[in-house]
């Protein structure tokens, strides 16, 4: 005979079974597992044979229930994500796109100092929800963005009662997921403070995809991209020449984002979003056991990769997928996974075009950042008035006024001045802490006079804060530096992090530096200052939350063409699929004098594009902060082509990706903010091709197309300055066929009549 308590328990089991059969497609199975487990624990204490049989049956039922998969679809049904635990309690996920498997069952989890969320987990609860909103960015590629996803949150519990929520958001173009550890039922030793040792996120791919990648490195993302099969990735063979801190992690470690193309025509981008208070994610490549990418977090100076405080979350791990390459470039998923704007009054944020004292430091036989040929500089002991200048200093009062005049004449918003402040004599390669004070100008730069002159001309000045990697020094002096900017009316600053990081042992992409970049952008926002960060961690969509972060470099920019083996012609056709997925890049386009032997006989360096392609980059390489990077005197030689740079917008109401193939070509059309005028950019790699530009995106009516294109004999290496300009009438039924030279492009202004 069964006692009353046992009879009651069996009745409960029966009711749970009935409910499961009725509601099994919902989240209840997780609740059943939890309740049945408690029942099993009680029954195990009983000693009768009947009880043992019941325990065996319940154990089987518990196993079946707990292996139930949780599935969530995108709003349009194209993307499917399934979460389940293995029999060992290991969390796994799988991703499909249009019934094609994109990510095979892949492990998930975190290893902490206080717990291991990688196995022996049980499902406690599962919740699903739908979210749909439309929001307007302060600036951007489109006027409004729809944020529409279905969410699944699974709650897992370890044997020591700590809990882990894994939150999935599934969009029509992909999925993002993140980890949210918490104390759960463990009140004795809560996760108030904890350390992350490792993240166990896998991306198990379905085949030997083509990959567009750069080698894993904790302190630089300024490598040229490689295009290989996953099985042919060998990071240690990559050339890091010209990169100040270019130590490669290992032969099978690459950086995210990575762009992939499968044999069956799927385009897959793997990255992260909302990187805050956490190290950046590299990817370890394993092709010995299938084709698997595994998270590799950038370490810090100590034993842990991250130090966290509850409540906390990791960045989103993102997978964007489509059968069209154009959809990858059109995706807003990274932005949508970031928090809404945190700045109450954004009136001070204005997209803009600028010129600057910068390129003349890169080309041969021109200017320098430093003022004198001296060594052993100690800032506090220097009498700069007594120092003999070497005569090559670029940031002089007169030279700055020349740039201000050019900006005022041609309608540019601002002038960047690099090398204005003392300390450049020993700024690189010494791991020195006291390099700059960010407030003291060189003797030949009259800050008062220059600021007043710019004000009279209606031109803003952009401040420059190069840190040389000495971040502790910058943080100590930042308030004083900002006060100087406010005094002289500076509204924007370009920061730089060339060199090894101080605190010593930290990395550019580690948690400590990610926290620093966040402190800087927040402090600048508080002081109503716009920010352009060079050599930071690559962006992950944080400009939604802090739109004063106008742009970052965080990749191999145009400057490398002046003094290294340069950027291959395919470079600009890969960057939008990789680095620019996380945010705008200050690529510094607009170089009209491509060959460096113009400045120095026999110099082999050159920009690996035609002049027309440099114009097209203002459209294909999105940024609300665009530089006309060449010397003013070079623009004066090509004023008809320069007109496009003067005309092109930097803020947009609409963007249409017309053609795209990573590593080969891109054609993009953008509609200027509050205007009927469109601009088109088309670029190609080292192969010439014909761009097919369907103008059906135009409204009804007649337009005048001003077309800047490669000349008949143009070639990025042999004849880069050959271009043609033509004007023709078009409408929305017009399809343009434009020949792009090798390494070439075209730029078009479409003005409604």
Where are these regions (language model features)?
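Aromatic- and carboxylate-enriched substrate-binding clefts and catalytic-loop regions
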Residues: 418-606, 610
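Catalytic domains of carbohydrate-active enzymes, especially glycoside hydrolases
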Residues: 399-420, 487-491
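Carbohydrate-binding surface patches
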Residues: 662-703, 747-749
